[in-house]
Amino acid sequence: MHLRLTLVALGAAYVCANAVESTMNRLVAETLTLLSTHQTLLIGDGNLMIPTPQHTNHQLCIEEVFQGIDTLKNQTAQGDAVKKIFRNLSLIKEYIDLQKRKCGGERWRVKQFLDYLQVFLGVINTEWTMES
């Protein structure tokens, strides 16, 4: 009985995680569409200068990207469409911040850490663009 309840709980957690991921995918897609549609409004007179990361591994530049978003938000006229863009970006940042909290983990034995390290390096090797 305990095993069955555990499996049900794991299944529910999986469904919940997939629902959140699916919602986030839709939110990102909607935000990309809004950015494309309202780019002229966001550019304004074109004189605003925002520090933009040169690094192509966007995962490493999250803080800088969101600092740029804050700068843009503070310097852009706030119509309904623009409010929606910045509300979406705020929700995306909250999601990323929640995910980052998972980085602080418990202590593991060396073998478990080395297994994690191998997966981590594999992601760097396959998903990150290497710059020289």
Curated annotation (Swiss-Prot):
Domain of life, per UniProt, equals Eukaryota
* GO function terms (MF aspect): cytokine activity; growth factor activity; interleukin-5 receptor binding
Q: Where in the cell is it found?
A: Secreted
Can you supply one Gene Ontology CC term for this chain's record? Answer: extracellular space
Where in the sequence does glycosylation occur per the annotation?
Answer: N74, N88
Q: Name one GO biological process term.
A: immune response
**Pfam families under this entry?**
IL5
Q: List, alphabetically, the InterPro entries matched.
A: 4_helix_cytokine-like_core, IL-5
- Keywords of this protein's UniProt record, alphabetized? Cytokine, Disulfide bond, Glycoprotein, Growth factor, Secreted, Signal
Tell me where it mainly resides.
secreted
Instruction: State the SUPFAM superfamilies in the record.
Output: 4-helical cytokines
Signal peptide bounds = 1-19
Q: How does it assemble?
A: Homodimer; disulfide-linked. Interacts with IL5RA. Interacts with CSF2RB.
The family assignment reads: Belongs to the IL-5 family.
User: Its biological function?
Assistant: Homodimeric cytokine expressed predominantly by T-lymphocytes and NK cells that plays an important role in the survival, differentiation, and chemotaxis of eosinophils. Also acts on activated and resting B-cells to induce immunoglobulin production, growth, and differentiation. Mechanistically, exerts its biological effects through a receptor composed of IL5RA subunit and the cytokine receptor common subunit beta/CSF2RB.
Q: Which PANTHER family match?
A: INTERLEUKIN-5
Q: What is this protein called?
A: Interleukin-5
This protein's gene is called: IL5
